[in-house]
Amino acid sequence: MGPYLSQPKTEKTSVTGQNQVLQYAATHMQGWRNTMEDAHISDLNIEPDVHLFAVFDGHGGSEVAIFAERHFREELMKNKNYQQKNYEKALTETFFKIDKMLQEPSGLDELNKIRGVTDEASLAGCTANVALIVGKTLYVANAGDSRSFLNRDGKPFDMSKDHKPDDEQEKKRIERAGGFVSDGRVNGNLSLSRALGDLEYKKDNRFKPEEQIITALPDVKVTQLSAADKFLLMGCDGVFETWDHQQILNFINSELKNTQNLQKAAEKLLDQLLAKDTSLGTGCDNMTCILIQFK
């Protein structure tokens, strides 16, 4: 059996919410893939005027994405730097804390229970694109190739960059740690160079966590939100295979102008991006997006 179904699963699971400062719609669709491996967080007011959103795109199984979805908020809020309002450092430390938890017996046991087997959980991983909104400050921490961008005055303002093995700095780290890049893949296998999980690439005790073949180290980008910022779109890589950011932005603007409905706009976006068939390979992945509109 190949990676694709004979017909796509186009049913969507969506959640919405709003408060005084923003409203959001989060939606996901399995699409052509045999399994659904994405997970996400959409959490208003984890404390007053602090909001948390995240996209986790799993590979090799859904268990690491589900684990991150379950534990990220709690671990972030327990973090001392978070409590001291050092949010950039807190986000980075929480990425590494999730990775550490995955390697502990209790974490491995939870992965196995999610997966339903006892021998392959360490092969799974996930991207992590996490947005923390604190008042008018937006922090986006990213490891992997999920993305976030703002609609800033009608133009996309990227809040993350993809971590790909062919990138010069990524390739240097991979090779220093004893790995190699072949056909744009780490050790000929993984098409991204930073992720949560993927524990088999993180076993060399000679190297720090940020120096391993695959690292959970996120880039953290910070910006001040203003009236120029209309919405933030977050998504797994499947959302960004077909259209560029400007095309996606224009589509969402048009839909919101017509419907004023975030959920309908997000769901219709996924329908537009879904491939008609699997011949080209693009538009065939699981798709998850979170659309956050600022009031």
Curated annotation (Swiss-Prot):
Q: Where in the cell is it found?
A: Membrane
Organism the protein comes from: Paramecium tetraurelia
Principal place of residence: membrane
A GO cellular component annotation in the UniProt record? membrane
Q: What is its EC number?
A: 3.1.3.16
Classification via InterPro entries? PP2C, PP2C_BS, PPM-type-like_dom_sf, PPM-type_phosphatase-like_dom
Q: Which residues form the signal peptide?
A: none
Q: Which GO terms describe its molecular function?
A: metal ion binding; protein serine/threonine phosphatase activity
Instruction: Give me the comment on cofactor binding.
Output: Binds 2 magnesium or manganese ions per subunit.
Write the record's keywords in alphabetical order, separated by commas: Hydrolase, Magnesium, Manganese, Membrane, Metal-binding, Protein phosphatase
Q: Which GO terms describe its biological process?
A: signal transduction
What cystine pairs are annotated? none
Source species, domain of life: Eukaryota
Described by its record, this protein's role is as follows: Enzyme with a broad specificity.
Question: Which residues of this UniProt protein bind Mn(2+) 2?
Answer: D57, D237, D285
Q: Name one Pfam family in it.
A: PP2C
Segments traversing the membrane: none
Boundaries of each PPM-type phosphatase domain copy?
Answer: 23-294
This chain's protein is named: Probable protein phosphatase 2C 6
Query: Its topology with respect to the membrane?
Result: Peripheral membrane protein
Keyword Plastid part of the UniProt annotation: no
